[in-house]
């Protein structure tokens, strides 16, 4: 089991999503991640991974695992902002 922690940037992104069904799907995926079942995830570099949520525009959650039990949710976005979001996630990870 993992301790899931969130950055303020991630919390703000998630709470500002207009699509409540998308919010619920993302929260569900985060809960699964907490139980060690990340699903559709791929590394994007600098220790950051991208969790893909197949809903709407293709939501993405960027996270970094620290140690064996802590996962930090860095930021989120969708397929249309993927390159910018990956760059931002790496910046946040470097600041931690």
What are the roles of these predicted feature ranges?
Residues 3-4, 12, 23, 38, ...:
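Enriched for short, Lys/Arg-rich terminal
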Residues 2-31:
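Solvent-exposed, charged helical/coil patches
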Residues 17, 33, 72-74:
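Generic leucine side-chain signal with a strong bias for well-ordered alpha-helical environments
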Residues 28-55:
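A short, surface-exposed loop/turn module that caps and links secondary-structure elements
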């Amino acid at each position: 089991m993992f301790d899931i922690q969130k950055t303020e940037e991630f919390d703000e992104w998630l709470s500002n999503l207009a699509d409540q069904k998308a919010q619920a799907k993302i929260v569900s995926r985060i809960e699964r991640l907490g139980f060690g079942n990340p699903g559709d995830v791929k590394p994007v570099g600098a220790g950051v991974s991208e969790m893909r949520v197949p809903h709407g525009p293709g939501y993405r959650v960027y996270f970094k695992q620290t140690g064996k039990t802590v996962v930090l949710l860095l930021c989120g976005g969708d397929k249309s902002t993927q390159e910018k979001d990956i760059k931002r996630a790496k910046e946040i990870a470097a600041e931690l």
